[in-house]
């Protein structure tokens, strides 16, 4: 993998692969090559345009990003643009069933859970993304081995890396 992407040798539950991606230009690196993953975005989004954030989300959706948790200044906007990218990709189909309108989504991207963690510590948001943010019980995801991808701007990289490599510390600081 390129220098931007580091596969961490971490002891994670269920043998989950853990990738650390440098988010220097807000672009999804093609070399990541994963499907069905949880993403954690730790960034200061104040300098990123709406189009840039939406482009990142749009690039991640075809890789079947199942969950995205955002942390850092202006993380609510990151959350909103991921939601927008999902809702408009692809166009939902509506059908009437048992007297109620239902919406179904493409099997390519059946579900996306998004959260933002404004006002929380980095450790708390990372713990949530790592241990809670996976759509368990959903048939599309039940039998899939999850991958955890942390997309991190340089100022937060070392702390995120250290926490991901030390699950006990992540739990201790994340639950504090």
Residue ranges and their predicted role:
Residues 1-176:
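ATP-dependent carboxylate-amine ligase
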